[in-house]
């Protein structure tokens, strides 16, 4: 990529990288995780980086789930532009509920692909393979997941035998090791190939189980701090942000606080007449039992939307109940990929479909989850000083703009 040749992607201009840029999306990283870890002496590098560089708290996009936010970060745009409205949605053309992992659902090009096309060397490492195809869409470069690092080929992933390259065993998808593999791979890539731009995306296994400041959480962030320090020592401009925060979703006794919307609507409108979609749904339900703080509802044609909104808003634990138009305007969502009604529950409450459809037997700790406005605040930290307008709203998808355009 020639020096001075800026590129434009989704309405934003980006300068070419002046030094290796590493954007890290720490899944489920409520800002308190960093604050507690620094206070407890677990993140000495981050503490110094926040003091000498840039330390902000910004907003993620809604719903506060993995797919919409990772794609917002790599496109520099909200879901209304890139089209990824959740991890899961109702595809009206196919008439089925589907995982939103196929690049065919992506409506915008990624900055990563454009940078690579302009001649930059680009690498992507993600914890879960569900994100890999979306993040790597159109990308000429390295793109693989920790989850399937034993299956990589030069043709499909830009690197053969990533497991041997990183020098670590294949991690369990339900472990902190899945994220550590991402960091280890990032350091190894920077040491050996020194990409111009690298995107690292972890999993929130630890955050779903452990609150900020607990020993397990601090241990995770201590591990992360060590790898970030090594990337810094290698000369990288580092941006640390998150796809969403995380909160306890329990009552005073530690039991999940759930409002089952499908059961409620079936009892009122008739069984199966309304369809509740939970965009948190993904293949890894042990994390959260497919329970989050955001839902979208498709209603039968003869139903008055205003009546449904009014009754849902009276349910305990509701923060916002909006019609499609207002919800998509407020949350910057594509109207054709959400239902007639959008439901957001408050900080300590999640929404489900039916009691019978949620298996919570895999939860071995009090439920912690995300999806709502209460999980929208995320850290935005750089190891460089930046030009940021005081008081301006910062979004997690400003990460590449900050690293490429605003470093002093």
Q: Language-model features: where?
A:
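Active-site-proximal N-terminal segment of extracellular/periplasmic enzymes that hydrolyze or transfer
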Residues: 1-54
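His/Asp/Glu-rich, glycine-adjacent segments
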Residues: 74-211, 217, 287-289, 293, ...
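Short catalytic/ligand-binding loop motif for oxyanion handling, primarily in non-cytosolic enzymes
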Residues: 31-33, 66, 82, 130-136, ...
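Secreted, luminal/periplasmic, and some membrane-associated catalytic domains
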Residues: 17-19, 26, 64-65, 89-102, ...
């Amino acid at each position: 990529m020639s020096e001075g040749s800026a590129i434009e992607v989704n309405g934003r201009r980006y300068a070419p990288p002046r030094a290796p840029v590493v954007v890290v999306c720490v899944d489920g990283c409520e800002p308190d995780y960093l604050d507690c870890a620094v206070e407890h002496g677990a993140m000495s590098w981050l503490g110094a980086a926040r003091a000498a560089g840039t330390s902000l708290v910004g907003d993620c996009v809604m719903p506060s789930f993995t797919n919409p936010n990772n794609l917002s970060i790599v496109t520099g745009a909200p879901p209304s532009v890139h089209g990824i409205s959740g991890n899961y949605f109702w595809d009206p053309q196919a008439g089925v509920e589907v995982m939103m992992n196929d690049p065919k659902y992506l409506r915008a090009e990624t900055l990563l692909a454009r940078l690579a096309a302009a001649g930059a060397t680009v690498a992507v490492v993600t914890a879960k393979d569900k994100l890999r195809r979306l993040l790597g869409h159109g990308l000429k470069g390295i793109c693989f997941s920790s989850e399937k690092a034993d299956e990589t080929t030069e043709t499909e992933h830009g690197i053969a035998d990533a497991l041997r390259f990183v020098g670590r065993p294949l991690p369990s998808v339900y472990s902190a090791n899945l994220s550590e593999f991402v960091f280890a791979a990032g350091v190894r890539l920077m040491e050996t190939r020194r990409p111009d731009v690298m995107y690292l995306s972890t999993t929130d296994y630890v955050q779903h189980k452990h609150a900020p400041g607990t020993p397990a959480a601090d241990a995770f962030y201590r591990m992360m701090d060590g790898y970030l320090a090594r990337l810094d020592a290698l000369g990288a401009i580092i941006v640390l942000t998150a796809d969403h925060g995380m909160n306890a979703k329990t009552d005073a006794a530690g039991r999940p606080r759930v409002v089952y919307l499908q059961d409620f609507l079936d009892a009122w409108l008739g069984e199966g007449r309304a369809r509740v979609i939970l965009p948190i749904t993904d293949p890894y339900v042990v994390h959260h039992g497919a329970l989050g703080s955001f839902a979208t509802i498709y209603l039968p044609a003869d139903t008055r939307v205003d009546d449904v909104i009014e009754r849902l808003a009276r349910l305990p634990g509701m923060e916002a109940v909006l019609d499609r138009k207002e919800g998509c305007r407020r949350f910057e969502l594509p109207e054709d990929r959400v239902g007639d009604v959008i439901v957001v529950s408050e900080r300590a409450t999640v929404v489900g479909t039916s009691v019978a459809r949620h298996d919570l037997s895999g939860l071995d700790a009090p439920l912690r989850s995300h999806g709502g406005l209460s999980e929208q605040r995320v850290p935005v930290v750089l190891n460089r000083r930046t030009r940021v307008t005081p008081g301006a709203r910062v979004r997690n998808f400003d990460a590449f703009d900050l690293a490429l355009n605003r470093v002093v």
